[in-house]
């Protein structure tokens, strides 16, 4: 049995020439205390942001609109097999700061064992930065901001998760 990533529509999810001034926080099934830590962190730095919560639902067109104008995003997500909201952000060339998971038991409300997992299954250094523990938030955030212009997440998506490379792996 082989598993294959579903391709990202990089034609649909591509950057435009919008000025990149927005910040977003994407939350999906992580503990509310972790969410509050990130919100407090952003507030303490006087950073305005848009929040998208998977469980509380959001309108995709609002998310896409922010992605087109986002200078970076922060992901607070449980485990993902692929994570299309993350894939869309990266296809829009938005660098991400990810509070990654180690175990499926980190999903808030889930009843999983300590099965190894990740929030970002398809990732490399061009996509942004990630960390595992709350005490790493500030230093990892500072790294992301100090090197923000160097990230190329869209290039990673074009090379690995656009239609063509996914199709080639099927053959």
Residue ranges, per PLM feature:
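Alpha-helical elements of Rossmann-like donor-binding domains used by nucleotide-donor carbohydrate transfer enzymes
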Residues: 37, 62, 69, 136-143, ...
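Acidic donor-binding loop of glycosyltransferase active sites
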Residues: 68-81
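Short acidic alpha-helix that forms the nucleotide-activated donor recognition element
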Residues: 59-70, 91
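Catalytic binding pocket for nucleotide-activated donors in carbohydrate/polymer assembly enzymes
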Residues: 81-160
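Active-site-proximal region of nucleotide-activated glycan assembly enzymes
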Residues: 1-2
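Conserved catalytic-core segment of nucleotide-activated headgroup transferases in glycan assembly
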Residues: 6-63
């Amino acid at each position: 049995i082989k598993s294959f990533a579903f391709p990202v529509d990089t034609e649909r999810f591509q950057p435009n020439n919008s000025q990149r001034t927005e910040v977003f926080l994407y939350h999906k099934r992580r503990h509310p205390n972790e969410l509050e830590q990130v919100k407090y962190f952003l507030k303490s730095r006087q950073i305005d942001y848009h929040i998208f919560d998977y469980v509380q639902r959001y309108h995709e067109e609002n998310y896409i609109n922010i992605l087109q104008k986002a200078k970076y995003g922060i992901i607070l997500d449980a485990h993902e097999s692929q994570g299309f909201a993350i894939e869309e952000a990266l296809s829009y060339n938005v660098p991400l700061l990810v509070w990654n998971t180690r175990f499926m038991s980190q999903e808030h409300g889930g009843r999983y064992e300590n099965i190894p997992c990740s929030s970002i299954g398809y990732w490399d250094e061009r996509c942004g930065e990630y960390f595992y523990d709350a005490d790493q938030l500030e230093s990892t955030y500072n790294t992301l901001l100090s090197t923000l212009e160097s990230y190329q997440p869209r290039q990673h998506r074009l090379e690995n998760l656009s239609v063509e490379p996914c199709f080639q792996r099927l053959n």
